Amino acid sequence: MYAQVKSFMNLRTKSKRPSLRELSSVSKLLSPRSRCAFIKNSLGFIIPWLKKKNSIDVLNLNFVNYKQLDNPSIYLDPKISLFARPQGTALHWLAGNVPVISLISLFQGLLTKNKNIIKVSKTFKNLFSIIFNDLENNFKINKKYNKTFKKILDSVFIVYVDYDEIKEMEYLSINSDVRVIWGGSESVKKISNLKKKINCKDIIFGPKVSLAYISKKKIKTEKDLKIFSDLFVNDVFNFDQLGCNSPHNLIVEKGTKFSLGKISKIIAKSFKERKINSETDPVNKYNLLVKNFTYSLEKKNSIISAKNYEWNIFLIKNFKIHEPVYNRSIFLSSAKSLKNLCEALPENTQSIGLYVLNSEKPMIVSKLSEKGVDRFPSIGKMSIYSNPWDGYLPMQNMIRWISY
């Protein structure tokens, strides 16, 4: 591994780095046939990220003039010219819950023209075999993009390292210029404490939780409630709630026209209509059984569950934000006011999906963002991975500014 990594890091990559024009058209590398297979078998949610429009949108969000990534230019003061250079080598530590999400940071590493090392646990070696088999069988490249695709592949190196291989992990860490770390609390702490260069930039996406909120003014009819429910199921079922942007609690503002019982039944109907493609993990199933038993002891609580606990709705009469149990499980409760919600929010809340009136959003976002919440997507769009993420515009930390 050491020789391979050293060789990759020492590559003279200036001529091999694709230009922004080439990278922003990367989705065209896929023919219609291969694109459909790619979506079905592996990384469907990544495709929108590869489209030219999204590439340009992300670049515009991160930089006043993203063309500075290609060429020097005058910036504001005519006496100052700036040029954005890549930091060098970006090391992407793959997340354990939803490993393919880390490809989003890889894409941004490519856009900023860094060399990219993807550190994969041996646990996920089979996952990448499936992805690359899919590519081999279905990936058709238009001939005019062959050079671009080769440049992209030359900018990426995948290495398998296990969690207990400290020597190998430290070697990767100390030879990187950017560390993009995805993972839980224990993993993030362990990786962060590895030796690194003094000027190495860390971009950390640590453990986060998310929830959803309904205002009493938003739902006036049963039709409104059904529309909400059909949108909400998209957020809950995505990645079986393993993503940090998946809601685990649904908070309804007190005073709505509908009781929690009525709301839970309509949500359950939407859950029943959704096809489930993955089986419940045995450990999670055991945890769900324990939760079901615990909550059934409280007379005020009630539970709606699918066969084999494929999804669960815990109806909680006393407002409280509960720890996730995963596998499409929701805790439904009612908060007296926004103030009560603010007081109950966990410190590591990432996203709050909103189903509120547009006129209410500025006040709600202002109040809840004071508690450290970074994202307020609309219900149905919580699972969209967009910039900024966890309060970061990652590409700003992937480049260094040259002035002259």
Annotated model-derived regions:
Residues R12, S27-L30, E136-F139, K143, ...:
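Structural signal for hydrophobic packing residues in well-ordered secondary-structure cores
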Residues P72-F237:
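Rossmann-like NAD(P) dinucleotide-binding subdomain of oxidoreductase/dehydrogenase enzymes
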Residues G183, V356, G380:
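Residues that line or immediately flank small-molecule/substrate-binding pockets and catalytic motifs
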Residues M1, R12, K16-S19, L23, ...:
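Generic structural signal for well-ordered, non-membrane alpha-helical segments
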Residues S102, D164-E165, S337-L338, E360-K361:
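Amphipathic coiled-coil/heptad-repeat helices and related helical stalk/stem segments
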